[in-house]
Structure formats: structure tokens, C-alpha cells
């Protein structure tokens, strides 16, 4: 099981305010075929102990295309919402990504295309995201230290973002003032 501590801040919208603060996130990947797995996520707010997120996602990988596709269910708990009401507000998730390596001589520099669609229980779309990222991985920057830099652009929100990952630490910053930090335990 993969476990991480996540801290988010800087949001100005009410729904982002409810997701700020320290959260404990757990993820389990269960292989079900050679190129497929079932991925379960769960998250609780560290201060209240209340669940903030639960998800179950079927992911299929296409190695020859450097792509993957995921389909699943997610529940976001907001403002200590009682459990039966939260289950009434679950959403469907469809996500896809494709990696492009423009310089075959340097496989550590690449372009990622990502898309995600969320739909309510009646299959009405509620949120869409699409992004393009330039990703650069630097192995052994210092002994035992791997670094990954990502510069991305959210196409639908017309907003750039940045990610810096160093071994167990990840820092994300968005041009609208939001940020988050993750530490993988």
C-alpha cells in the first residue's frame, strides 16, 4: 500500500477551502491482468479524522502506445457531510494519458497529454480537464537523488502549473495561487 501525507492551500473558492489542510492518503494497486489493475484510493483529513475522498478505478495500460485509460467511481466528502448523503453524490471518472518522447536519444525528456472527465450519477458531465506537460527526469542529480520537473498547461482553464518532485517529496504550484505538497511515506 502506498501512503502519503498531503498538504494543500491557497484556494480562494469555497469548495477548495474545504479541501485545504493536511490529509492522509492511501492507495492500493491490485493487478488483475498483465496490463490492467484495480486501483483503490482513500483519504482522511488529519485534523478531523473525517474521510475526504474514496475512489475505485480500473486502469488499463497500453505499453506499445505509451498510454493508459482509467474508468471508475469517486466520492468526495465535503464539510463533514454525513455518509448516506455523500454516497448520493458519487461521480464517475474517465481519465486517459499519452506519453510522447520527442527525442528518442533522451527518453528522460518527454511530453505528456492528459485528460479527465467527471460525471454525476446520471452521467451528466460535471468537470473536465485537459493538460499538456513537458516532463524532465534527472536521475542521480546527487547520489541517490532523482528529480523530476514538469511544466504543464491546463488547456480548458488556460492555466500554467509547475511540479517539482525529489524522491519522496512533490511540490505543485498553480498560477491561480493554489499549491500542494506531498510526502510519500
UniProtKB/Swiss-Prot annotation:
Which stretches face the Chloroplast intermembrane side?
40-63, 99-105, 139-145, 171-176
Its placement in the membrane is given as: Multi-pass membrane protein
The record places the following residue ranges in the Cytoplasmic compartment, namely: 1-29, 74-88, 116-128, 156-160
Instruction: Tell me the superkingdom of the source.
Output: Eukaryota
- Output the InterPro entries linked to this UniProt entry: OEP21
UniProt keyword list:
Chloroplast, Ion transport, Membrane, Plastid, Plastid outer membrane, Porin, Transmembrane, Transmembrane beta strand, Transport
Start and end residues of each stretch annotated as Disordered: 1-22
Please give the start and end residues of each transmembrane region: 30-39, 64-73, 89-98, 106-115, 129-138, 146-155, 161-170, 177-185
Naming one, the record's GO cellular component terms include:
pore complex
Please state where this protein is localized: Plastid, Etioplast membrane; Plastid, Chloroplast outer membrane
Q: Which Gene Ontology BP annotations are present?
A: regulation of monoatomic anion transport
Q: Name one GO molecular function term.
A: voltage-gated monoatomic anion channel activity
Q: Which family does it belong to?
A: Belongs to the plastid outer envelope porin OEP21 (TC 1.B.29) family.
The record's function comment reads: Voltage-dependent rectifying anion channel that facilitates the translocation between chloroplast and cytoplasm of phosphorylated carbohydrates such as triosephosphate, 3-phosphoglycerate and inorganic phosphate (Pi) depending of ATP to triosephosphate ratio in the plastidial intermembrane space; in high triosephosphate/ATP conditions (e.g. photosynthesis), export of triosphosphate from chloroplast (outward rectifying channels), but in high ATP/triosephosphate conditions (e.g. dark phase), import of phosphosolutes (inward rectifying channels).
**What is this protein's record name?**
Outer envelope pore protein 21, chloroplastic
**What lineage is this protein's organism placed in?**
Eukaryota, Viridiplantae, Streptophyta, Embryophyta, Tracheophyta
What gene is behind this protein?
OEP21
